């Protein structure tokens, strides 16, 4: 569990990992980037507010986006319903410690 919700790893191989992220209502992940992996996000339930670089946009069910490695990004749930996102990570290192937090409301 995380302060913003939960994640479940569905499949993990050497060069990719597939997760389901559940972001609780009105919560957000840290503004962050990863050195070794890129991510694809597909919204399967709810509405996502996405920041990638200096751009911010909304994704609805069945919409997706790509987050390149080393690009700052944040996933938020602006609604009162849970947000579920399928995250596909790819890269040469997929450890949970490959994260640089630039801003974090939970002070991690």
PLM regions: where:
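Double-stranded beta-helix
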Residues: 1-3, 74-108
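A short glycine-rich, His/Asp/Glu-containing loop-to-beta-strand
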Residues: 1-38, 93
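A structural signal for the main folded, soluble domain(s) of proteins
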Residues: 10-11, 47, 74
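A generic "binding-loop/recognition-motif" signal
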Residues: 25-27, 36-37, 55, 71-72, ...
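Short beta-strand segments
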Residues: 29, 55-57, 98
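Short hydrophobic/aromatic-rich beta-strand segments that constitute the beta-sheet cores
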Residues: 30, 50-52, 75
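Glycine- and acidic-residue-biased ligand/ion/polar-headgroup-sensing regions
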Residues: 35-54
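Short acidic-glycine-tyrosine-enriched beta hairpin
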Residues: 53-72
């Amino acid at each position: 569990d995380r302060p913003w919700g939960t994640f479940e790893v569905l499949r993990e191989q050497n060069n990719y990992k597939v997760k389901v992220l559940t972001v609780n209502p009105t919560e957000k992940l840290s503004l962050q980037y990863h050195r070794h992996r890129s991510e694809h996000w597909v919204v399967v339930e709810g509405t996502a507010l996405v920041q990638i670089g200096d751009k911010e946009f909304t994704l609805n069910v069945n919409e997706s986006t790509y987050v390149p490695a080393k690009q700052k990004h944040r996933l938020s749930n602006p609604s009162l319903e849970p947000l579920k996102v399928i995250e596909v990570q790819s890269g040469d290192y997929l450890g949970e410690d490959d994260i640089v937090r630039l801003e974090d409301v939970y002070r991690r």
